[in-house]
Every structure is written in structure tokens, then in C-alpha cells.
């Protein structure tokens, strides 16, 4: 920041995060397992860094100790791949909730899914992700439930250009859409497009979810437009993509 005041502003919320973790994880090492390796890992620090908003202080009530489980997605899995021959894969798969139905097939280690929640079990009422769905997605014999999974291949001039997708339940669609919009409409690089803060709205509930890194100005504009704001403690989706540009392969998570 170039000044003492600027430096203090830069580190204020980092101090809060450090003390939140202190309250949760530190104690007498003779009787407490202290996760030093996890607390100091690059992945964990990157995760915590997304919470920082240098322009405005984060209220302490909104800060929670970090969650190491978040380093590996507990939800849907997505991967995007391009090989040396130009073959491209965008693949998303899921068992829906964390650990699916919570039932393991004896002797196999295989978890059973709970994809039935993707149906409108009761049309007009929310499912596990808060999505309100109608009769078109009602439970019926032989039907496949509606899914938010969005594995995407983008072609330019008839050739593969981008492979992308994300986990995130109902937030997958908006996460992938915003990433592609950033590239195709706003000329962002793949890295910029992926790391740019995202918003999410799914009609019901009538709230705009915003990531921790969203600018206060953006939030103010949304609120002035009568949007109800829901601040997320984590990213909206976890987009990972591969882009082929001028003979180069670019990947970003």
C-alpha cells in the first residue's frame, strides 16, 4: 500500500482470520493435535485469501475458522482435459450430496447416490439446494432427474477452444456461464475469468449470493437495485478449464 495506514488496512482482516483459526485449532500440543501442516499449506492459504476484502473491513461475526475439508470438494467432481493430440474432454460426475445417500454397498466401498433429490419430489417446493421445480421434473418411472451439471466444450472456427465445468450443485450453471462470459464478452484471460468474483441467483429463494471477494461497490449497486444479498463464505462453484490459444494450452482452476 505504500503507507503505514495502508499497511494496517492490508493486514487487519488477515489478523482476524489468524485469530479465528487460533481459537479453533491451537492448544497444548501434548493433548491436542495441532494441524500445522494444513494451516500452513498453500492450498489452505489460497482458500483463506479469497475471503479478504481490502476495500472494507469484514465484520468479525462473518469470520469463521477455516475448514480443511473444503480443500477437497465434498460435492460434484469436474475435470477438463486436453491431450497432445488435441483430444478434449469436459467431464462432470456426482453422487449429489456429500457422500450421496450415506450408504455404502457392503464389501465394495462404493457409496450410493441420492440423485432422487434432483427430481421435484413435491413440485413447487424447494429441494436440498433450495431449487423450486415444477411438474415437468416430477418423479416418474423411467425418467431422468434434471441436473445442474454443465460440462462444456466451446468451439471456435470449428476447432476446440475451451473445455470447462464446475462442481457446486445449483450454482454450477451460473459459475460456468460467468466464466465464459468473462472470456467471450469482456476479453479476460482464462485465469482472470476464473478467479473473478461471481454472483448467483436461482429465482428462488429470492436472494443474490455473492462471493467473499466481490467488491463493496458491486454489492451497493445490487442492493440499490433492490436485490437481497446473501454473502457466501466460499466460492460459487470451483470452475476448472483448459483453453487452446495460438497453439498453447492454458489451464486454470
Task: Give a label for each model feature.
Residues 88-156, 162, 186, 190:
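Active-site rim segments in enzyme catalytic domains, especially the processed small/beta chain
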Amino acid at each position: 500500500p505504500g503507507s503505514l495506514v495502508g499497511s494496517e488496512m492490508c493486514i487487519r482482516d488477515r489478523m482476524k482470520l489468524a485469530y479465528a483459526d487460533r481459537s479453533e485449532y491451537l492448544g497444548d500440543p501434548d493433548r491436542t493435535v495441532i494441524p500445522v501442516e494444513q494451516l500452513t499449506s498453500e492450498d489452505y492459504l489460497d482458500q483463506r485469501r479469497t475471503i479478504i476484502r481490502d476495500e472494507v473491513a469484514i465484520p468479525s461475526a462473518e469470520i469463521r475458522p477455516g475448514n480443511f475439508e473444503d480443500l477437497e470438494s465434498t460435492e460434484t467432481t469436474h475435470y477438463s482435459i486436453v491431450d497432445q493430440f488435441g483430444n478434449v474432454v469436459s467431464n462432470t460426475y456426482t453422487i449429489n450430496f456429500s457422500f450421496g445417500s450415506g450408504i455404502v454397498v457392503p464389501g465394495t466401498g462404493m457409496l450410493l447416490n441420492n440423485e432422487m433429490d434432483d427430481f421435484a419430489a413435491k413440485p413447487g417446493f424447494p429441494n436440498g439446494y433450495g431449487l423450486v421445480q415444477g411438474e415437468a421434473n416430477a418423479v416418474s418411472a423411467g425418467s431422468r432427474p434434471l441436473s445442474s451439471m454443465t460440462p462444456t466444450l466451446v468451439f471456435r472456427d470449428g476447432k476446440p477452444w475451451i473445455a470447462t465445468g464446475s462442481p457446486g450443485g445449483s450454482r454450477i450453471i451460473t459459475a460456468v456461464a460467468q466464466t465464459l462470459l468473462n472470456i467471450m464478452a469482456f476479453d479476460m484471460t482464462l485465469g482472470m475469468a476464473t478467479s473473478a468474483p461471481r454472483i448467483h441467483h436461482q429465482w428462488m429463494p429470492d436472494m443474490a449470493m455473492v462471493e467473499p471477494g466481490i467488491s463493496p461497490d458491486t454489492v451497493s449497486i445490487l442492493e440499490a437495485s433492490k436485490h437481497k444479498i446473501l454473502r457466501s463464505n466460499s466460492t460459487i462453484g470451483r470452475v476448472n478449464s483448459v483453453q487452446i490459444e495460438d497453439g498453447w494450452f492454458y489451464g486454470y482452476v
